[in-house]
């Protein structure tokens, strides 16, 4: 029998320290383990050519841990447990089953006992108020349990030998701090997340080593700034990216003890003003030392200028190359952020760099000097903002007339530049939402529409032919010659017009001078002025329909590429002929009584009189994607009947991939996103065209997607894309979805018949693309995939059969060889057997000695004499 007061099993002497508190090396929202520098961005953007008075980056003034160890949450020790009283069952003098024990010193336990030990579920309360509820194994807290401290702090999770070990959650009551993740020996260790406020806006998620942030993790600060990367000793250390959302900055690169050190990229995102045409950012790519731009690096300015050279403490110092936005270059020494030797040029350089208009700067002696430094002196009447590439065209003329040809055609462009800018702006804005800076970038899709509106294709040239002509003058990859996503700057647009003018009219004016001037003038007179900005076709005719049609563009481009074939003309890029288009529809089983071959020809030839005259058809012309897509939009209204749309009166907005309501730049941005390594975009800005080559990769941001419609709540909703640009509203009617631009609120609502017409068009378009075209394409691709699989399987089976046949043939050959070998062996044995008697007799003849005269015995004589007597 065990006495009431006895010493418990020595296993009860095992320590069971409580979980160390979150204040063990924890960083709170206001402090992050090293300095207040943690959320500060590095030095600001320098002004080019002028000394920068910028705030010096704050270094680590102290690397002391915060006062985070003020209050500790540690386990009390299960000391030598002397039982003062016990209430419960006993078996053979040992505590067994459920009971209550009070220990010497004020600790208590209520729960399960086994063989005199705390074993199973129970609650242990220390004298200081610390409580453990959970599993016990032989007097030791084990497996899963809950620690509760006197101040209300709590841990729930896995416990090993009384220590937090495994996965668990800790919540501090005195401060809004909580941790959920892995533990080891009472410390945060492994993967875990810590939250520094109740709102959950300040947190760290990542790797821990012994209560220290070490490894890879994400830190979100209360201000919204975010760091994602490597950590060491609670500080940013290694490769990582910091985004200062409050100041629209971003740094990606090397860190050392919380500060930029090593190679990295720092970007300052800008908000552009109305009518600006600059890129979206200033960007530095190069070396950093203690948060400063120091060493070798490149700085790309928002104006289009660029400095490549040496830096010292955020200042241009040493040898460098400065390229202005107009293409002029200075290469030489810099001192303390100034161009060495030319201090009087600073103000003029800055004003030249920051010009926001297309007007050429007033030339002075110093500006002319800079032009001559790099040998780029130019006398173009268009100024430095627009550079026409006329070398290939001028090579068509004798050298003696080239200067005059160039001068006259530049004068012609200058006289029409205002109108050409307006045309460029008009077409580049088609299918786009509202732009914050009123600037749009033309794409090949817009350019094709411009060419068709101005009837360029009426001069025995298809759009595909024009693409090949223009690509021959540029280093364009073969697969991108007919891409609708290719962007076209204003100067490129002007160059394209000059090249097309020459190819269309040069035979007419080849004997007159200045020939190129006359070609361009006639193009403006007969093609562009009478027809530009008069939209034809059915893609860009109405803004609402354009925005909705763009949701199907990506999938249609995929289908177009799938059915292209190499062109017969160099460079043999993939194109689609009309006959290929018709064959595709036939394969899709879409040629029927509604859409006949004759109807197909009428739609294709709607704005091209040379393809079909009502009797004869020409199926050889190639189609670019614009013609392909517009034809599909026309087929949608022809193929889909009212009966087919009855079951689709409520069109889901995002039922299938690609069926989302977006602007053209959503589509273009998605396609070009991977092509532009420097396309780091601001979340609150749109892209624009710029004379700088760096801006050519920029795109307008995403437009809003359309949310799913609740049939029971026909109300107006709004959806905003993650890029926070234009908005789109819609409402549900009895016949489908009606879409509105958010800007149309200030106008009068459409009439009922207009709404009805638009709803019918939306339904027809949805049914045609989603339920007919895309479904047929998917089915056809599945069939092709099955055919490919069958061919592969047949090939594999044929190879297997061939291998088996070869193996069988080899075995037969081996068998035949063995039989022949056996026969040959038997034959040799027979020959040997037949030869043996002869060999034996011959051997006897040879080996026997010569016989002597025979001596007749007397008996033999007697026998002979007897025969004679008879």
Curated annotation (Swiss-Prot):
Residues 1-16, 683-692 have a biased composition (Basic and acidic residues). MORN repeats lie at residues 86-108, 109-131, 132-154, 155-177, 179-201, 204-226, 227-249, 251-273, 284-306, 307-329. Residues 17-39 have a biased composition (Polar residues). Keywords: Cell projection, Cilium, Coiled coil, Cytoplasm, Cytoskeleton, Flagellum, Repeat. Its main location: cytoplasm. Residues 693-703 have a biased composition (Low complexity). It holds the Pfam family MORN. GO terms for cellular component: 9+2 motile cilium; cilium; cytoplasm; cytoskeleton; sperm flagellum. InterPro entries: MORN. Residues 784-811 form a coiled coil. It is found in: Cytoplasm, Cytoskeleton, Cilium axoneme; Cell projection, Cilium; Cell projection, Cilium, Flagellum. Residues 1-44, 674-704, 840-870 are annotated as: Disordered. Interacts with RSPH6A. Does not appear to be part of the axonemal radial spoke complexes 1 or 2. May function as part of the axonemal radial spoke complex 3 (RS3). Radial spoke complexes are important for ciliary motility. This is Radial spoke head 10 homolog B2. The gene is RSPH10B2.
